[in-house]
């Protein structure tokens, strides 16, 4: 089996596509033959060493947190899925020819592999953020960073819930935001004022996907600081906002099921750019540069 890996922290150029040990499904897990695996910002942050806490790399490093493929091994206690089923979901070290998933759903037959691979992390993260904010029909939510992988999925999931969605992006992505159901505002300095103008005042909730706007500015948009949830600014709690990175907040199997339903009903559209695994360096460079519309996906 081959996998994307690195033997030192650094830029995307340190990545190699080479032989790796074959993983096996543990209890409550499944293994898949990977047909597509997505690239998330966390991947290049890990690659750069930003998440290492200053500790040296112990052995080869592997990347990837979501993928789609065909089930080829079931762990102990797994039910409701069989070898040969086509699935997508979340796991670890998914940028490989085989990968183990710990949360999954059956892939809708109408959805291609790349789109399914892009739905794991984005779907779970979006569902978690909207659930923590308890977004309801008729409410207004501001999503800061609406054109990227998580942001675009969150926009659509909030719209399905009946919310009015305001989302920030570069001007080049405003047309895209309108297509997926959001009122676009320009990101960057002064975004709070632009959100107020679009909303006619305060909003009911803020989902901070980008982590670029000062949290104090985001908190000023809502009546209670706890109505700001961030996945990208780990200092947001200092201003009374909530930070979520998964853990106890996460309900991944429920999230995967919701996303699968939305994909099957064409209520969720995920834009993807695909790259063969031997062009992973290029995909990582694009991800690291930012302002990606939708998701970047690697194909073995």
Where are these regions (language model features)?
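C-terminal hydrophobic helical "lid"/dimerization subdomain
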Residues: 1, 33, 256-300
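N-terminal glycine-rich beta->alpha transition that marks the start or flank
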Residues: 11-14, 19-68
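A glycine-/small-residue-rich N-terminal strand-loop-strand element
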Residues: 68-91
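Short helix-loop-beta connector
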Residues: 82, 109-112, 134-140
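A structural motif shared across PLP-dependent enzymes of the aminotransferase-like
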Residues: 90-103
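Mid-domain Rossmann-like dinucleotide-binding core that forms the NAD(H)/NADP(H) cofactor-binding site
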Residues: 119-188
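Glycine-rich phosphate-binding loop and adjacent beta-alpha segment
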Residues: 178, 209-269, 277, 300
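Short amphipathic alpha-helix with an adjacent loop that forms part of the alpha/beta core around
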Residues: 191-201
């Amino acid at each position: 089996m081959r996998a994307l890996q690195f033997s030192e922290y650094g830029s995307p150029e340190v990545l190699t596509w080479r032989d790796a040990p074959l993983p096996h499904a543990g209890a409550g897990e499944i293994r898949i033959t990977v047909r597509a695996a997505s690239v998330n910002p966390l991947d290049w942050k890990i690659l750069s060493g930003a998440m290492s806490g200053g500790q040296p790399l112990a052995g080869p490093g592997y990347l990837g947190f979501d993928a789609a493929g065909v089930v080829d091994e079931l762990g102990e206690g797994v039910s409701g899925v069989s070898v040969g089923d086509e699935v997508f979901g979340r796991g670890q070290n998914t940028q490989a020819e085989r990968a183990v998933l710990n949360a999954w759903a059956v892939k809708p037959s109408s959805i291609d592999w790349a789109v399914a691979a892009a739905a794991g992390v984005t779907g779970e993260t979006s569902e978690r953020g909207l659930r923590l904010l308890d977004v309801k029909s008729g409410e207004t939510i501001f999503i800061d960073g609406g054109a990227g992988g998580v942001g675009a999925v969150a926009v659509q999931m909030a719209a399905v819930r009946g919310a009015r969605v305001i989302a920030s992006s570069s001007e080049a992505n405003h047309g895209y935001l309108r297509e997926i159901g959001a009122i676009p505002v320009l990101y960057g300095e002064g975004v709070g004022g632009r959100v107020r103008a679009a909303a006619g005042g305060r909003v009911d909730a803020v989902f901070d996907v980008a982590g670029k706007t000062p949290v104090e500015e985001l908190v000023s948009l809502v009546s209670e600081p706890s109505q700001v949830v961030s996945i990208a600014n780990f200092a947001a709690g200092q201003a009374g906002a909530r930070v979520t990175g998964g853990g106890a907040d996460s309900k991944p199997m429920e999230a995967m099921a919701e996303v699968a339903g939305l994909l099957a009903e064409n209520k969720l559209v995920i834009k993807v750019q695909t790259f063969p695994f031997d062009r992973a360096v290029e995909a990582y460079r694009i991800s690291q540069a930012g302002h990606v519309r939708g998701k970047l996906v690697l194909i073995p």
